[in-house]
């Protein structure tokens, strides 16, 4: 294909949208946008307005009601009816989007709308529905990284999207050959929320032309916004559903409304089944002929989790049942179309209250069953089915049962539910970036071949548990974990789970960790959890303790660490606290390794969990479920889920991946070999050297295009290094990869310097640079051990009596500061340099370095505020008040800001506002740690 400019791509899209049924209109500025909105509003409400279009005052009143709202509030207004008082005191209800009859909305498209707020901006393609800009399309020419379009959207949203542009629901970005969509939000836009569109078979629809044909047809787009965008009430965000979620819901709705048959949805673990099942439940509960939608879960811990998730998507949508009598009441309450309960409670309700549920012998009911492969489902399903004669059953699972991994009674998922309505496999999810792939290691803990409990070649009399839990082996495994944990978890940036074969094994490992932990400079935070049996078998006297006693000790250790007060009488609360702890991964206050037998291996999602240690036998669905705890997408510093097996589960892993990805090619799911990544590194390193042969030559680059080439080349190199570090054989030496760590740190310093320069220029100047929208992927560069706390620890160790040693300490700190990659540390770099150069030499052994540094920072902060206030002729105390508010709220108080700036010309006012906001944000970060 010949070279195609961005302008040509935009024009081609405008022509295509016109052919699809959009009215092409010319709107160049905000006034024309408002005029067009007003005209359409009057046309759509002609009957309600009784031939009297909105007057200027009435329209202004309306704008006052709908303008200046958050994106979240604007999304709610869009889907609601708004009462407007007319000049004659009558009231009329206005609507902005027909969410049921999608094709009855008015569809328009325009391009090159110009706005000027703090910065000038011109938007590529704007789709208007009923006059409101609901979809914004940003384009880049072919060959440009699509992430640049994403970063441009982020910049525009921060600087320019005001007024009616607050009603944008969705962004579409494309470079012609790659296209993504994502929802608008008040919070930070995340790359992980950019989605591909696909067909029903999960084949990507990438080109802009085919994307527009499939996704942007007027009725389809209105349907997507109306039905398949979710207003998350808890987090106050907008969520766009992914294509496979949409297709699954459509297939399930069709099966439920057009047939009497059952079905199941196979969507891989971590792909968002809860949202899919909620949307299906919600739509079905609105059907007149369906009397009740009952969402069944199998376990108590998942019950509360599902309820919490459902209520996020529609506040108050779920009435959780606490006991069977309440469940019976809710089943008979016609005002409750949707109920979430457990299958155990449902079975009990039928057994004890069948006469109260007579109506459901004939009424149409839909059951939606989460994780429908659960072992208890089979028997209880038969009982429920006997009572609900006119019911349909729809299952959701990430790991269905097939003949090779059928349930205990020999049945498969298809035997219970019938046809599979939609599939989205683990290979699809990894390909789309919705979950991560796996890096799997197999550590042989025996000198000879690895032992397997089911190995028929072993003499039957051998006590395999005795072999697996031999003191020497347990210590070997524990030491391997301790020695490698920081590498696997990026210096404890992430947490891990260690799954073992039995409660006895768990106790033994916990005690070994506890003993070895005492010798570590930085001890690991270890926790253990299991369910004890009140009347426990003592295994013929082999184990001289009751497991409850050991759990009590683990809980006591946990209480000391986290200042809690749990016991074996409050194990549910202990479980919930651990769950929140592992999910949040709060820095310096989190669990590093959670030891379990089976708990937390299914139905538990944590983005900050990246490593699973395995010392037990796993197969098929159990293996995939366990591995999948590690593969939730977080940020660039988490490129895969790390699995460390202390048993030879290679065959089991390959078999499970073959079954659940429906392919023999597992390369798309598992990381490639070390040699492949090493070759990739060599190629990237050569490319970097061709652009800038040495790190210091980056300083000589004048041309922005050349600087951009350097950024892109080093960014690729850094990504490969991140993957290489996951391999035990990796050594950061010239002999191994042709580059040593020092050279990498030097290149990284230059890379971060370019990032800081671009960030500063963006904040201070109304200037557009080609580097503004480059994705620097800063999170990938961070080494969390080298931060402000790390430097402060070195400062505390400075020998104030031995001047020669003091100079060595100072030089060490300077070297570290030169290569700082922690954002806050880079902000403090000059402060710390000045402190060690000017203050430290004057201190003696009686001085408190911590206090001296606090005093030094306080003086510098005071001077910085005084200087900024004097330079801009603003009140210093008012500036400090704004800064203090920002420190606690994260928001610059607009009322205080307006008062402080005073009466300035509009352009000057914007400049002053921007400068103050930047100053407050930077000084808060600089002096806030």
Curated annotation (Swiss-Prot):
It catalyses: Endonucleolytic cleavage of DNA to give random double-stranded fragments with terminal 5'-phosphates, ATP is simultaneously hydrolyzed. ATP binds at residues 268-274. GO terms for biological process: DNA restriction-modification system. Pfam families: EcoR124_C, HSDR_N, SWI2_SNF2, T1R_D3-like. One of its GO terms (molecular function) is ATP binding. The type I restriction/modification system is composed of three polypeptides R, M and S. Belongs to the HsdR family. Type I restriction and modification enzymes are complex, multifunctional systems which require ATP, S-adenosyl methionine and magnesium as cofactors and, in addition to their endonucleolytic and methylase activities, are potent DNA-dependent ATPases. This is Type I restriction enzyme SauMSSORF170P endonuclease subunit. It comes from Staphylococcus aureus (strain MSSA476).
């Amino acid at each position: 294909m010949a070279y195609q400019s961005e302008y040509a791509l935009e024009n081609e899209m405008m022509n295509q949208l016109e052919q699809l049924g959009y009215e092409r209109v010319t709107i160049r500025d905000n006034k024309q946008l408002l005029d067009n909105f007003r005209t359409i509003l009057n046309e759509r409400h002609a009957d309600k307005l009784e031939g009297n279009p909105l007057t200027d005052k009435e329209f202004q009143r309306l704008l006052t009601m709908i303008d200046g709202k958050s994106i979240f509030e604007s999304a709610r207004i869009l889907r609601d009816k708004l009462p407007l008082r007319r000049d004659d005191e009558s009231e009329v209800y206005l609507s902005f989007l027909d969410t049921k009859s999608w094709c009855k909305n008015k569809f328009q498209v325009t391009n090159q709308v110009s706005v000027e707020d703090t910065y000038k901006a011109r938007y590529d393609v704007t789709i208007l529905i009923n006059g409101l800009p609901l979809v914004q399309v940003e384009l880049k020419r072919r060959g440009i990284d699509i992430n640049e379009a994403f970063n441009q959207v982020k910049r525009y949203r921060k600087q320019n999207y005001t007024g009616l542009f607050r009603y944008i629901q969705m962004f579409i970005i494309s470079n012609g050959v790659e296209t993504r969509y994502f929802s608008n939000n008040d919070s930070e836009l995340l790359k992980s929320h950019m989605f591909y569109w696909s067909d029903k078979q999960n084949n990507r629809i990438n080109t802009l032309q085919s994307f527009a044909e499939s996704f942007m047809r007027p009725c389809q787009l209105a349907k997507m916004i109306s039905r398949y965008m979710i207003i998350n009430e808890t987090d106050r965000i907008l969520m766009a559903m992914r294509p496979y979620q949409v297709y699954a819901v459509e297939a399930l709705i069709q099966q439920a409304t057009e047939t009497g048959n059952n079905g199941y949805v196979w969507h891989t673990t971590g792909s968002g089944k809860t949202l899919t099942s909620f949307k299906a439940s919600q739509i079905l509960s609105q059907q007149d002929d369906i009397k009740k939608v009952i969402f069944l879960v199998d376990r108590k811990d998942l019950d509360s989790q599902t309820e919490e998730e459902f209520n996020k998507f529609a506040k108050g949508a779920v009435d959780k049942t606490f006991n069977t009598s309440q469940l019976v009441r809710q089943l008979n309450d016609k005002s409750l179309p949707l109920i979430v309960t457990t299958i155990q409670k449902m079975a009990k309700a039928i057994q004890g209250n069948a006469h109260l549920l007579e109506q459901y012998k004939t009424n149409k009911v839909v059951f939606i069953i989460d994780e429908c492969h659960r072992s208890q489902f089979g028997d209880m399903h038969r009982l429920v089915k006997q009572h609900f004669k006119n019911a349909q059953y729809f299952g959701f699972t990430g790991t269905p049962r097939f003949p090779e991994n059928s349930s205990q009674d020999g049945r498969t998922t298809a035997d219970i539910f019938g046809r599979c309505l939609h599939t989205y496999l683990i290979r699809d999810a990894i390909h789309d970036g919705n979950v991560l792939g796996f890096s799997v290691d197999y550590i042989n803990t025996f000198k000879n071949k690895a032992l397997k409990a089911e190995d028929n070649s072993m003499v039957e009399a051998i006590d395999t548990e005795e072999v697996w839990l031999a003191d020497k082996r347990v210590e070997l495994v524990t030491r391997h974990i301790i020695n490698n944990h920081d590498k696997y978890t990026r210096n404890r940036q992430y947490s891990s789970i260690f799954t073992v074969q039995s409660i006895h094994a768990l106790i033994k490992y916990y005690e070994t960790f506890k003993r070895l932990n005492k010798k570590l400079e930085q001890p690991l935070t270890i926790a253990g959890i299991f369910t004890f049996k009140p009347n426990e078998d003592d295994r013929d006297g082999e184990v001289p303790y009751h497991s409850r006693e050991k759990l009590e000790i683990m809980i006591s250790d946990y209480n000391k660490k986290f200042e809690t007060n749990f016991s074996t009488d409050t194990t549910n609360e202990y479980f919930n606290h651990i769950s929140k702890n592992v999910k949040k991964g709060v820095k310096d206050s989190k669990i590093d390794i959670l030891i379990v037998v089976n708990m937390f291996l299914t139905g538990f999602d944590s983005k900050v969990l990246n490593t699973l240690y395995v010392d037990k036998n796993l197969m098929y669905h159990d293996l995939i479920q366990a591995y999948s705890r590690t593969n939730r997408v977080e940020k660039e510093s988490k490129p895969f889920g790390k699995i460390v097996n202390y048993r030879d589960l290679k065959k089991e892993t390959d078999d499970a991946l073959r079954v659940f990805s429906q392919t023999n090619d597992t390369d798309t799911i598992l990381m490639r070999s070390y040699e492949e990544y090493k070759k990739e590194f060599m190629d990237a390193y050569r490319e970097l050297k061709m652009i800038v042969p040495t790190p210091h030559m980056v300083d000589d680059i004048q041309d922005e295009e050349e600087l951009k080439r350097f950024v892109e080349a080093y960014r690729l190199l850094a990504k490969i290094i991140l993957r290489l570090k996951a391999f035990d054989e990796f050594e950061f030496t010239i002999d191994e990869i042709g580059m040593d760590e020092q050279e990498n740190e030097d290149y990284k310093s230059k890379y971060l310097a370019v990032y800081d320069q671009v960030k500063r220029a963006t904040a201070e100047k109304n200037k557009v640079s080609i580097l503004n929208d480059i994705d620097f992927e800063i999170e990938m560069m961070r080494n969390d051990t080298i931060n402000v706390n790390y430097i402060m620890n070195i400062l505390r160790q400075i020998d104030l009596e031995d001047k020669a040693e003091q100079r060595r300490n100072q030089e060490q700190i300077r070297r570290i500061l030169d290569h700082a990659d922690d954002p806050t540390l880079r902000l403090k770099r000059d402060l710390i340099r000045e402190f060690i150069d000017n203050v430290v030499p004057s201190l003696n052994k009686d001085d408190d370095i911590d206090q001296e540094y606090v005093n030094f920072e306080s003086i510098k902060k005071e001077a910085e505020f005084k200087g900024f206030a004097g330079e801009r002729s603003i009140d210093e105390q008012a500036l400090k008040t704004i800064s203090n508010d920002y420190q606690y709220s994260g928001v610059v108080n607009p009322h205080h800001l307006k008062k402080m700036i005073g009466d300035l010309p509009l352009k000057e006012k914007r400049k002053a506002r921007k400068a103050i906001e930047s100053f407050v944000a930077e000084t808060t970060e600089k002096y806030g740690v």
